[in-house]
Amino acid sequence: CFSGSEEELKETKHTQPCLFAMEMAAYEVLKEKGIRADSMAGFSLGEVAAAAAAGVFDLETGFRLVMRRGALMQEEAENFDTSMAAVLKLPAETVKRLCGEFSQLYPVNFNGPEQITVSGLSTQMKLLADAVKREGGRAIPLKVKAAFHSPFMLEAAAGFQKELEAVEVRLPQTVLYANISGEPYPKSEAKIRQ
């Protein structure tokens, strides 16, 4: 985390454990200061940290899950030349339409009314950037080497699901919101694994 090169840290097998460690360290500092959350949520990898902080599993289990998640996603990333970009200053409908003009570009994160993250093939991403500019928007390449949150990660998601099924989980000790639905986690350990 602290001594790796930028290239090494761009590899998700390294990035994810580093981010998880930083998130959990920040949580522990807040806890030491007596700050307690009424509820928790995390986006993408952050949901694993939020689940660990909420007591769904212990820190060591969370770290093992993150290591495996990063490795699975790295394997998929190495199969394709993919990337991501943040598209700014265009409405979601325009971004969806532009992505639809390409065979393997996907609007994946709707971060705000005019900030949508797109994942897909790097060759198509470059063409999308030109199309976005013609529409009056801006595409900012993200410093990642994979198309996260897209169909390019389906095998990794299936592998991670198997990992989750083998882990002992508990009900959250505080309200924990799922990033897929925005709803509190279910009151069922079996459903938490989903």
Describe every region a protein language model picked out:
Residues 1-41, 118:
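Helix-rich "cap/lid" substructures immediately adjacent to catalytic or cofactor-binding pockets
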Residues 4-5, 16, 54-194:
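Alpha/beta catalytic cores of group-transfer enzymes, especially the acyltransferase/condensing modules
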Residues 19, 26, 47-50, 72, ...:
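Hydrophobic side chains within alpha-helical segments
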Residues 23, 38, 42-46, 50, ...:
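Gly/Ala-rich beta-loop-alpha elbow adjacent to hydrolase catalytic centers
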Residues 29-33, 51-57:
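Alpha-helix C-terminal capping segments
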Residues 34, 44, 168:
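Conserved functional loop/turn residues at catalytic and ligand-binding sites
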